């Protein structure tokens, strides 16, 4: 399948649908962890309950700050509007907590059919969330597409048997080889779906 032919579109949230201006280096600094530490994976190894709660509180505050600062990525709102017009199902799969996710979605008016956070499905790169969405839509994973900006997103798609699309930014071009598709701007994908509509019509 080519871009514009997939029967459902699933998005990562931060760095994909929205720019939350998240600085994970700063988060690691706040936590006192080495730069580049995988946040949720390292948190799961913390055995001391007091330290776990301290770290979790810092992470949750960080996510809420991101939700309050988030803005639509260029072209994302127009793409979602077109997909809804064409009755193509849409979803969000994010590693964020539920309260921060919904604060962001409600503040920006982002509407999709399914939203799964790390409290609703195992966190990426576990493919369970993508498979849950595919099952809810009763569509084969191979006929859907997952769009994200990080290697976790691409690994999650691959594990689910779903095409993975890298949403490019200034720092993630080295993930190109892990992606089935690469997208520089949401207007490009919107055009693909517009052309599909004309062909079908």
PLM regions: where:
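Active-site neighborhood of HAD-like aspartate-dependent phosphohydrolases
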Residues: 1-43, 48-51
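Asp-based, Mg2+/Mn2+-dependent phosphohydrolase catalytic module
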Residues: 1-7, 81-85, 98-201
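Conserved phosphate-coupling serine/threonine residues in phosphotransfer and NTP-handling enzymes
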Residues: 16, 94-96
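A general structural signal for well-ordered alpha-helical segments in protein cores
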Residues: 24, 39-40, 52, 56, ...
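Hydrophobic alpha-helical core bundles mediating ligand binding, dimerization, or RNAP-core interactions
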Residues: 24-28, 60-63, 101
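A short acidic, glycine-rich active-site loop
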Residues: 41, 66, 119
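Metal-dependent phosphoesterase signature
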Residues: 45-81, 86-88
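Compact structured core domains
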Residues: 88-89, 95
């Amino acid at each position: 399948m080519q871009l514009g032919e997939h029967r459902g579109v699933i998005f990562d949230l931060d760095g994909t649908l929205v720019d939350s201006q998240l600085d994970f280096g700063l988060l690691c600094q706040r936590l006192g962890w080495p730069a580049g530490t995988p946040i949720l994976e390292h948190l799961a190894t913390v055995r001391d309950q007091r330290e776990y709660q301290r770290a979790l509180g810092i992470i949750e505050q960080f996510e809420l700050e991101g939700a309050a600062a988030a803005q639509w990525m260029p072209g994302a709102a127009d793409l979602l509007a077109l997909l809804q017009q064409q009755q193509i199902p849409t979803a969000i799969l994010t590693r964020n907590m539920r309260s921060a996710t919904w604060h962001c979605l409600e503040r920006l008016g982002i509407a999709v059919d399914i939203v799964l956070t790390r409290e609703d499905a195992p966190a990426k790169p576990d493919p369970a969330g993508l498979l849950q969405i595919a099952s809810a839509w009763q569509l084969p994973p191979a006929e859907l597409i997952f769009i994200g900006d990080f290697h976790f997103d691409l690994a999650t798609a691959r594990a689910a048997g779903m095409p993975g699309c890298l949403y490019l930014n200034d720092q993630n071009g080295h993930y190109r080889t892990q992606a089935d598709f690469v997208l520089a701007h949401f207007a490009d994908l919107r055009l693909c779906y517009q052309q599909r509509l004309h062909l079908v019509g």
